[in-house]
């Protein structure tokens, strides 16, 4: 456990919360914007470095507040430019944050929980069980740490982080309030100023919270589907027993239509040899998604010891992709980046992180990043 100081951590406060904090200590609300810029634009955690803040206020802040992100355990850089941070949160658990560069884009994959309670059969993270929800400061702190590492100012055109995906450890919708607060900071001009189209939340399908999402925020949505029928998805994603596909896809369509503009759902589909990669599965998927504006990411499974699953052949993957293409869907197949640092750090977070989920995230993150600007409307089934 990391000892708590009892002070208010300003790192995770939204603009509204920051203004209320300054009210509570008898200061003007405009101070909130000043301090937020120092924290998020310049990565400052020392109040004495906030030079446009009076000395008296700095002393007051030192007495009752702090700026504290997760503790960086390690930072590794792959030969392809991918970066991975292992960070320790207040519960004592470690989580991962991954940065994937691609041309002028830089996508950061952020964790929302330590461990996971969903127990998906092809993902050993769930087998470790759930440890804790991350605080808003620990979620946005991953962006803060990465930004500081690059020495990048968020508001500038050459900033390192252009996209963020909530696709790290955990189910974001099961840590709803903290994830919402962190995503607001990602998009706030006093925070990181990232476009709503470039912030993506990935979910396994917590239907009530998908319905709640549109009341609180407007971000892109990705669904971890992995099966084209309920019987198979019940095996792969046990959450499906509670929220079957018909109900789940209806909730996704409601959310997408609530955005009031032409946006599409991203479907993530991990391909498992002889499990969900056959022609009949592609045919079922075509029928399942016919009323859902979407694009599809096919993610070849990356085996890990004792998983019980294998990666399909390249021919099987291409055949599956071709069938979906012929039906009018925009479909991509992606390969992993950062494999060399994946292996190097696997043991460090072995109790809370597995190789398969990392592979799935790296691939999907890369595609989501590329998707923002390049996918023509005509190429997407609507």
UniProtKB/Swiss-Prot annotation:
**What processes in GO biological process is this protein linked to?**
rRNA base methylation; tRNA methylation
- Which Enzyme Commission numbers does its entry carry? 2.1.1.192
Places the protein is found: Cytoplasm
Q: Which InterPro entries match?
A: Aldolase_TIM, Methyltransferase_A, RlmN_N, RNA_MTrfase_RlmN, rRNA_lsu_MTrfase_RlmN/Cfr, rSAM
Q: Where does S-adenosyl-L-methionine bind?
A: 170-171, 202, 224-226, 302
According to UniProt, the reaction catalysed is: adenosine(2503) in 23S rRNA + 2 reduced [2Fe-2S]-[ferredoxin] + 2 S-adenosyl-L-methionine = 2-methyladenosine(2503) in 23S rRNA + 5'-deoxyadenosine + L-methionine + 2 oxidized [2Fe-2S]-[ferredoxin] + S-adenosyl-L-homocysteine; adenosine(37) in tRNA + 2 reduced [2Fe-2S]-[ferredoxin] + 2 S-adenosyl-L-methionine = 2-methyladenosine(37) in tRNA + 5'-deoxyadenosine + L-methionine + 2 oxidized [2Fe-2S]-[ferredoxin] + S-adenosyl-L-homocysteine
Quote the catalytic residue positions. Answer: 96 (proton acceptor), 345 (s-methylcysteine intermediate)
Name the principal localization, coarsely classed: cytoplasm
Q: List the disulfide bonds.
A: 109-345
Q: Which residues form the Radical SAM core domain?
A: 102-342
* Pfam families in alphabetical order: Radical_SAM, RlmN_N
Residues in a coiled coil are none
Q: Give the co-factor note.
A: Binds 1 [4Fe-4S] cluster. The cluster is coordinated with 3 cysteines and an exchangeable S-adenosyl-L-methionine.
Any one GO MF annotation of this record: tRNA binding
Keyword entries, A-Z: 4Fe-4S, Cytoplasm, Disulfide bond, Iron, Iron-sulfur, Metal-binding, Methyltransferase, rRNA processing, S-adenosyl-L-methionine, Transferase, tRNA processing
**UniProt xrefs under NCBIfam families:** rRNA_mod_RlmN
The protein's job, in short, is: Specifically methylates position 2 of adenine 2503 in 23S rRNA and position 2 of adenine 37 in tRNAs. m2A2503 modification seems to play a crucial role in the proofreading step occurring at the peptidyl transferase center and thus would serve to optimize ribosomal fidelity.
Q: Which family does it belong to?
A: Belongs to the radical SAM superfamily. RlmN family.
Q: What else is known?
A: Reaction proceeds by a ping-pong mechanism involving intermediate methylation of a conserved cysteine residue.
What is the protein's given name?
Dual-specificity RNA methyltransferase RlmN
Q: Which organism is it from?
A: Pseudomonas syringae pv. tomato (strain ATCC BAA-871 / DC3000)
């Amino acid at each position: 456990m990391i000892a708590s100081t009892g002070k208010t951590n300003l790192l995770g406060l939204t603009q509204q919360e920051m203004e209320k904090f300054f009210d509570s200590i008898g200061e003007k609300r405009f101070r909130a914007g000043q301090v937020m810029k120092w924290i998020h634009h310049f990565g400052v955690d020392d109040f004495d470095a906030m030079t446009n803040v009076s000395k008296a206020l700095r002393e007051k802040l030192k007495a009752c507040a702090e700026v504290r992100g997760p503790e960086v355990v390690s930072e590794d850089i792959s030969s392809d430019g991918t970066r991975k941070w292992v960070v320790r949160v207040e519960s004592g658990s470690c989580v991962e944050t991954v940065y994937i560069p691609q041309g002028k884009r830089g996508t950061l994959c952020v964790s929302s929980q330590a461990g996971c309670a969903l127990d998906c059969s092809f993902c050993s993270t769930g087998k470790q069980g759930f440890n804790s929800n991350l605080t808003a400061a620990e979620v946005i702190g991953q962006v803060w740490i990465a930004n500081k590492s690059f020495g990048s100012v968020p508001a500038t055109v050459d900033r390192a982080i252009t996209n963020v995906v909530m696709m790290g450890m955990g189910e974001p919708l099961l840590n709803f309030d903290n994830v919402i607060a962190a995503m607001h900071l990602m998009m706030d001009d006093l925070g990181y100023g990232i476009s709503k189209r470039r912030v993506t939340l990935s979910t396994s399908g917590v239907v009530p919270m998908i319905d709640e999402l549109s009341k609180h925020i407007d971000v892109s949505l990705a669904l971890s589907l992995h099966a084209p029928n309920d019987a198979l998805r019940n095996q792969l994603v046990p959450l499906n027993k509670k929220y079957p596909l018909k109900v789940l896809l209806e909730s996704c369509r409601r959310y997408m239509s609530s955005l009031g503009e032409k946006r599409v759902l991203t479907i993530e589909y991990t391909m498992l040899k002889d499990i969900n990669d056959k022609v009949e599965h592609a045919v079922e998927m075509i029928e399942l998604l016919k009323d859902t504006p979407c694009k599809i990411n096919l993610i070849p499974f990356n085996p890990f010891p004792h998983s019980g699953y294998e990666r399909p052949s390249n021919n099987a993957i291409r055949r599956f992709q071709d069938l979906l293409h012929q039906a009018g869907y925009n479909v991509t197949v992606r390969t992993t980046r950062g494999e060399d640092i994946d292996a190097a750090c696997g043991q460090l977070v072995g109790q809370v992180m597995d190789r398969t989920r990392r592979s799935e995230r790296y691939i999907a993150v890369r595609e989501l990043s590329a998707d923002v600007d390049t996918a023509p409307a005509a190429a997407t089934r609507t």
